[in-house]
Amino acid sequence: MPTGRAAIFKGPGIPFEIREFPLPNVEPDAILVRVTMANICGSDLHLWRGEMQPPAPIHPSGYVTGHEMVGRVAALGQNITTDSLGRPLKEGDRVVYTYFFPCGRCYACLDGLPNACPTRFTRFGPRRSDVPPYFIGAFGEYYYLRPGHYVFLVPDELSDEIVAPVNCALSQVMYGLELAGLRAGDTVVLQGAGGLGLNAAAVAREMGAALVIAIDQLPQRLELARQFGADEVISLQEYPTPEARVER
């Protein structure tokens, strides 16, 4: 029986366990992906440090965490012939997919707010490693896309390094700026130039913002913000109060 390895999370501060699991049987409308690259998101660190609550109580068997990833199709369900945009899909193709799984039928989804779907995390299946499909996070050799999960082909010109974080930081800021109604010629102020802020600077610039301002206390982040598209940067060390920053 074919198997794959995964890192099992059992709780904050507990070392991950590398374990081997049988590959799940692929349902007719599901996809099994061989993960080629996974990133460590800031939320992964917060979870391991105990600084944030997991989406559900941690089962004694633990589960696979991580959500920033890219991979290649290892097995297609018999009913799957295309990605979510209707493009032909076959084994070996490189794909990326959302890390949440909205139902598409609730009030939030129908109102264009899939991020507020109450079942966007529970639809992955049981968060435990003692029952299939086992591979429900990025920190495993495989990832199981359940029936109905969004999946998209990756252009050859984009590297795994670029694509792996797309379904987290990049998609979050794109959605956030669209939700905020950013239009060409607007001014955007970014409160923080971490991973999300840097992506937001680049996206705001691409969306036509006339002025992008980044605020942070770390000089190296402010320098990166300029490289990512910020026109002006404001240091919290130099301007510590809101009044001083507004005057600046």
Predicted region positions:
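NAD(P)H dinucleotide-binding glycine-rich loop of Rossmann-like/cofactor-binding domains
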Residues: H67, C103-Q191, Y239-T241
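Nucleotide donor/acceptor-binding cores
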Residues: G4, D93, G185-D186, A210
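Glycine-rich beta-strand-centered segment in the early N-terminal region that forms part
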Residues: P24-A38, M52-L110, P155-E157
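Cytochrome P450 core scaffold surrounding the K-helix E-X-X-R motif
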Residues: S43-R49
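N-terminal Rossmann-fold NAD(P) dinucleotide-binding loop
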Residues: G197-L198
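Residues located in well-ordered beta-strands
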Residues: R5, E17, P22, R34, ...
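Adenosine-nucleotide cofactor-binding segment
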Residues: T187-L190, R205-R248
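Surface-exposed amphipathic alpha-helices with a cationic face
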Residues: E178, A201-E206
